[in-house]
């Protein structure tokens, strides 16, 4: 079936959307008869499928192939997939009798879908549970741009691939100077890749630890710019769920860029029964006790991030294990003391972020406004 796609150049250039999942396809198919061809996972096997909008529903049909190499949906067969689609379009015969779904408009590939040959991986920058991040070169319109490319291993589970694509889908909706920009994704072959702007100074955490002591003006700037990015995400109803200095990247000019949207979601509130792989020392008490994430739990985590900035990148709750920190926060209502180098106005703001009652915590819009005013003084 892969050979069919490689030899069918017209299909490759037009309606073929690779391994783009259902959740990404859905918003592309708006009108009756809109359709794409894509790859999908069925019972552990990668197959070709047709997705079509019909009577407001998104329908999916397997592209079948007989022993002679001919392609078909139900009965009519053609030598190429392109011929099969064109036959259904021109004759107006439905894809299946039961659905009566007809093919009217093929949706051409989106500008954010990139070809693998547009990117050259150079050097590994790091790795995670499901793949690696590479310093890479992105070549388009005879321009070469340094980028970061996040990959997912071929052997990753279907669920891991869907999470990876969800991260890219969330990032595509954002455009802010303090949020990492996504250039596009590569879904036409393995490995799947997310192409992002390069932040050459690495994480804020590593910068703080490499450059002790960072001057107070830069520390305030870090906190202010992080709050700007988070205020923007708040306005987009995005709960990040993993706010920490390690997930803030720095540009060449040391601009803060909020990154790592692997745990993020666009909801008002999230219940997570398992709390797997969550960074305990950055969690709000209601997350620890009730498994709840909300914009206000992000505000709590931001308070811990600001503590990290003024503590020169030390781990929060020094000397305490995760279990000990949890017990002190929840049972004893313990709060860390802000480092003495922090301006009193910043410390007061952080202590408000750590209020037990989420409704008493400030919004990111307010936090950013107050930090920005301090930065001007």
Predicted regions and their residues:
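A short, aromatic-enriched beta-strand patch in the conserved N-lobe beta-sheet
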Residues: 184-185
